[in-house]
């Protein structure tokens, strides 16, 4: 373990390697330093500094066009004044339910300038979930895309409401029925609530003074096992969290990143925060489209792509000739997180795009635990990687004792991101300063972590412990299987039995017995599913996690 002095030196080296501190004009650098001293390290400071250092650089690209850092600085000052005039104050909470676009970015920065906390709502949640969250969190204001008007109508009574994005008729037609559950542009309140653009146009662009206390960031858990919790986190007091990420993922200043992962989720939001100090150009597609993502990378010469694993799966389903149509030689980094990355998929992605894939493992509460580099994924495709700079990961048994390499234990982690607990009370288990991720895993001899599954997903069948992940990964390796999920169901004789839900590829010629035989040839007999159900697709949430409770409910 390095000494504090060695650690600080490594942090400095890592940050310098990003070129974010390159001095181009001393006068601007001095102003930027003063801004950081006054504002700290939040979103307001990062974008203000970029507006000082590179005002004319493109900060954002979305369907409506481009915005420079100087334009975003002026617009978010005006928006912050407009929100304040409407009644939003320092310490208030503002709920944001937006897709990836300028409205999300500008709402976040304006709230940071006011000292208001930001609560990010999952755009895939159903109306009752949204209503439960809004009533529990009781934000002062709600900023939403007009397509979600019906979804937010329950639970938002008495709140200041603002529309971040209204689709044009052409955009609604292009979207088709993909988001029918969210209702259309004529949803409740959608045509009467003021628009952010109106607040910006009428607002005072005078820069604000820093708040006495910065607001918090609240990101919701996925809600795969029930009502989503609000994970509250304060702004970091140093740049050490950035150094942790940059120690494994070689992002550089003044490059371009396509964020396909939803920004309301930890991973999409995380890439947004990584881009801030780098003055990166963000390309923000509102909806994920596999070929459209490749087109955006090629068109904007993006060096990085942020995705959740299911997006990679959809990209790899494109015909090879479609992928070959785009010049992707600029792409240095594909950064994936949010759900399990099957080893077979990791290998296919790197065989297609080169050794540019990085896989981050963590949780909403822990933020990050480990990161797998392309070298890790080549050596051990199913690995979650190793802890980055300043991060500690330990595997503990039921008594809290550390387990040896190769042995399974509960995963605990500690890093520089401070989780302040759930907004509704409570938190995650902590042992000797390490927080539980809720998963089980093991280290190999090289120190690479492998996540075996959720600690509450373990299936006990005939007295034997089985984690679904091992069987799922094996099934995904089959050349005729696209993806699979495994659950435990009650069994009178064995207590539980394994049931597999399988999505086959278009030209597959498999039946239930062939799949059982395949598993039996590769794993212990007690890991063979007793039932195999063929389905067209697996139910997933917005970040790609399989909704196993829906599979269980389907029987």
Features from the language model and the residues they span:
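Conserved AMP-binding/adenylate-forming core of the ANL superfamily
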Residues: 35, 39, 56-101, 105-109, ...
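Conserved structural elements of the adenylate-forming
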Residues: 73-78, 202, 231-253, 313, ...
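AMP-binding/adenylate-forming catalytic core of the ANL superfamily
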Residues: 125, 132, 142-144, 295-297, ...
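Gly/Ser/Thr-rich phosphate-binding loop
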Residues: 277, 302-306, 320-380, 392, ...
């Amino acid at each position: 373990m390095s000494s504090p002095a060695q650690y600080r030196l490594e942090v400095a080296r890592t940050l310098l390697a990003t070129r974010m501190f390159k001095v181009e004009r001393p006068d601007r650098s001095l102003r930027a330093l003063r801004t950081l001293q006054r504002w700290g390290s939040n979103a307001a400071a990062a974008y203000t500094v970029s507006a000082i250092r590179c005002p004319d650089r493109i900060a954002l690209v979305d369907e409506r066009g481009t915005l420079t850092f100087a334009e975003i600085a002026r617009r978010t000052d005006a928006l912050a004044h407009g929100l304040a005039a409407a009644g939003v104050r320092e310490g208030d909470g503002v709920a944001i339910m937006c897709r990836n676009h300028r409205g999300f970015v500008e709402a976040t920065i304006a709230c940071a300038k006011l000292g208001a906390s930001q609560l990010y709502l999952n755009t895939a949640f159903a109306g009752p979930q949204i209503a439960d969250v809004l009533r529990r969190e009781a934000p002062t204001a709600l900023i939403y895309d007009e397509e979600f008007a019906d979804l937010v109508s329950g639970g938002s009574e008495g709140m200041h409401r603002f529309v971040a994005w209204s689709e044009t008729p052409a955009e609604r037609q292009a979207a088709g029925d993909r988001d029918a559950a969210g209702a259309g542009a004529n949803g409740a309140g959608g045509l009467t609530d003021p628009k952010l653009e109106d607040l910006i146009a009428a607002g005072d662009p005078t820069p604000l003074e820093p708040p006495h206390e910065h607001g918090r960031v609240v990101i919701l858990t996925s809600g795969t096992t029930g009502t989503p919790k609000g994970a509250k986190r304060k702004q970091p007091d140093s740049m050490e969290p950035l150094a942790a990420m940059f120690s494994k993922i070689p992002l550089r200043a003044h490059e371009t990143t396509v964020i396909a992962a939803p920004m309301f989720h930890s991973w999409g939001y995380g890439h947004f925060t990584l881009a801030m100090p780098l003055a990166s150009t963000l390309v923000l597609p509102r909806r994920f489209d596999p070929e459209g993502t490749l087109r955006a990378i090629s068109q904007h010469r993006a060096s990085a792509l942020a995705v959740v694993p299911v997006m990679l799966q959809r990209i790899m389903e494109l015909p090879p000739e479609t992928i070959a149509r785009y010049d992707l030689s600029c792409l240095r980094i594909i950064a994936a997180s949010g759900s399990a990355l099957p080893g077979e998929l990791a290998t296919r992605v790197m065989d297609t795009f080169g050794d540019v894939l990085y896989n981050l493992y963590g949780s909403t509460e822990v933020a990050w635990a480990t990161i797998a580099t392309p070298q890790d994924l080549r050596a051990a495709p199913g690995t979650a990687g190793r802890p980055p700079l300043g991060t500690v990961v330990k595997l503990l048994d039921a008594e809290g004792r550390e387990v040896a390499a190769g042995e399974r234990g509960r995963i605990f982690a500690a890093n520089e991101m401070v989780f302040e607990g759930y907004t509704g009370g409570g938190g995650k288990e902590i042992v000797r300063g390490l927080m539980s991720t809720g998963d089980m895993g093991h280290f190999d001899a090289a120190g690479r972590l492998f996540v075996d599954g959720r600690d509450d997903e373990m299936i006990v069948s005939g007295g034997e412990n089985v984690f679904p992940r091992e069987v799922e990964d094996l099934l995904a390796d089959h050349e005729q299987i696209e993806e699979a999920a495994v659950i435990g169901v009650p069994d009178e004789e064995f207590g539980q039995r394994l049931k597999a839900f399988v999505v086959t590829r278009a030209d597959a010629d498999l039946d239930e017995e062939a799949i059982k035989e395949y598993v039996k040839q590769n794993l212990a007999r007690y890991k063979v599913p007793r039932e195999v159900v063929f389905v067209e697709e697996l139910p997933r949430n917005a970040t790609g996690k399989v909704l196993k409770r829906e599979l269980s409910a389907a029987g």
